[in-house]
């Protein structure tokens, strides 16, 4: 299948209400979010600050939907990556349309700022992706000829050491400006 374009939406906004989570017949979770993005500017004629808010319908699927229902609350700031999709339906003989941002397994949701008064939420800046995270692979020790060693050769997964930033605030740079 040839790709004839890119359909990618990135939003950073605040939730206008708590997520609405429901489960479809196959057991998968679906969450609906109302995300507001705002733009402000100074009116050239009056000098007043103006603001325009756009509301976006965001639909999350699977584990992302479950996490959204558990962790997100009205007022939380979120980062969303998804796809734009328009769907239609008939309502008393009138064709209705709605455009939504779909966040499927290839999408991302990241909570940036907690809502005021929210309680059981993850750390700020925690990112959730629709793709399953790889499980640590168990290392199997083998003898010559491929036979497994005693105890099946399984080792406990060890966390990888994180690189440490350089000491001090200079990050290896001098304070001299080169011009």
UniProtKB/Swiss-Prot annotation:
Residues 117-179 are annotated as: Disordered. GO terms for molecular function: single-stranded DNA binding. Residues 6-110 form the SSB domain. GO terms for biological process: DNA replication. Residues 118-132 have a biased composition (Polar residues). Residues 145-155 have a biased composition (Basic residues). CDD domains: SSB_OBF. Residues 167-179 have a biased composition (Acidic residues). SUPFAM superfamilies: Nucleic acid-binding proteins (SSF50249). Keywords: DNA replication, DNA-binding, Plasmid. InterPro entries: NA-bd_OB-fold, Primosome_PriB/ssb, ssDNA-bd. PANTHER family: SINGLE-STRANDED DNA-BINDING PROTEIN (PTHR10302:SF27). May contribute to the conjugative processing of DNA. It has a functional relationship with Psi (plasmid-mediated sos inhibition) proteins. HAMAP family: SSB. Homotetramer. This is Plasmid-derived single-stranded DNA-binding protein. It comes from Escherichia coli (strain K12).
């Amino acid at each position: 299948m040839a790709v004839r374009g890119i359909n990618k939406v990135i939003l950073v906004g605040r939730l206008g209400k708590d997520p609405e989570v429901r489960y479809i017949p196959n057991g998968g979770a679906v969450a609906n979010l109302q995300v507001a993005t705002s733009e402000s500017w100074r009116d050239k004629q009056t000098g007043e600050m103006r603001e325009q808010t756009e509301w976006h319908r965001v639909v999350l699927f699977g584990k992302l939907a479950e996490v959204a229902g558990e962790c997100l609350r009205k007022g939380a700031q979120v980062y969303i990556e998804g796809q734009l999709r328009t769907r239609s339906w008939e309502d008393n003989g009138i064709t209705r349309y709605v455009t939504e941002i779909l966040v499927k397994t290839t999408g991302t949701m990241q909570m940036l700022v907690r809502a005021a008064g929210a309680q059981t939420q993850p750390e700020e800046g925690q990112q959730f992706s629709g793709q399953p995270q790889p499980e640590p692979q168990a290392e199997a020790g083998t003898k010559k000829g491929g036979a497994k060693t005693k105890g099946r050769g399984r080792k406990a997964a060890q966390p990888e050491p994180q690189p440490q930033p350089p000491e001090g605030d200079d990050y290896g740079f001098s304070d001299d400006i080169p011009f």
